[in-house]
UniProtKB/Swiss-Prot annotation:
InterPro entries per record: dsRBD_dom, RNase_III, RNase_III_dom, RNase_III_sf
One GO-annotated biological process of the protein: rRNA processing
Broadest EC class assigned to this enzyme: hydrolase
Name assigned to this protein: Ribonuclease 3
Subunit structure: Homodimer.
Signal peptide per UniProt: none
Designated gene of the protein: rnc
Positions annotated as active site in the UniProt record: D51, E123
Chain residues that bind Mg(2+): E47, D120, E123
Record-annotated DRBM domain positions: 160-229
Length: 232
């Protein structure tokens, strides 16, 4: 953890008073499970807390930044900023991927590169920072790490493919659009979902993701990229 502390101090002017709290933020459940006798804490509770403060601060930022955007647009933009892939990217930017404690099996299976694990660790770090410092320090960190990319327009370019597909298909009237899970693979804490999108019972696209919502977006994207002619 000393290397992590150095990174935090040199790049973000952050020094944790409670080093155990910082270590917990970077401890995956797989590591804690492999060391049960030591009663090591994992980062899921901190992730819960970090998710809440992240949602609050990003919501506040978007509310003030875009006074004319309707609630629906703000919600979509926030969802893109705090989604799994985005948070994993921020974690990599901060070099957090190097410091996550994983179980041997998780490490061997490529867990250090998984967006779910990286995104969760990023949120857990925010939760730990909130407890060790205060919400102002979390806000300072978010504005240093995340907001520059938001203001650069990186997340405006991401398309909500489910909404886009619905708009394309319903231009001439309502049609029945349904998403269904084809398969689920992987351990309970890191599942991969395969989803297909159906229009009037006909499969028009398939997608894969670490959550059902992400898989649905990928399926909708697949359908949009095929073109409407193949959808109806």
């Amino acid at each position: 953890m000393k290397e992590l502390q150095t990174v935090l101090k040199n790049h973000f002017a952050i020094e944790f008073a409670d080093k155990n709290l910082l270590e917990t933020a970077f401890t995956h459940t797989s590591y804690a499970n492999e060391h049960r006798l030591l009663k090591i804490s994992h980062n899921e509770r901190l992730e819960f807390l970090g998710d809440a403060v992240l949602q609050l601060l990003i919501s506040e930022y978007l509310y003030k930044k875009y006074p004319k955007k309707p609630e629906g647009d703000l919600s979509k933009l926030r969802a893109m900023i705090v989604r799994e892939e985005s948070l994993a990217g921020f974690a990599r930017d901060c070099q957090f991927d190097q410091f996550i404690k994983l179980g041997k099996g998780e490490e061997k299976s490529g867990g250090r590169n998984r967006d779910t694990i990286l995104g969760d660790a990023f949120e857990a770090f925010l939760g730990a920072l909130l407890l060790d410092k205060d919400v102002a320090k979390v806000k300072e960190f978010i504005y240093q790490v995340m907001i520059p990319k938001v203001e650069a327009g990186e997340f405006e370019m991401i398309t909500d493919y489910k909404t886009h597909l619905q708009e394309l298909l319903q231009v001439n009237g309502d049609v029945a659009i349904r998403y269904q899970v084809i398969s689920e693979t992987g351990p309970a804490h890191d599942k991969v979902f395969d989803v297909e999108v159906l229009v009037e019972g006909k499969s028009i696209g398939q997608g894969q993701g670490r959550s059902k919502k992400l898989a649905e977006q990928e399926a909708a994207k697949n359908a949009v990229e095929k073109g409407l002619d193949s959808c109806i």
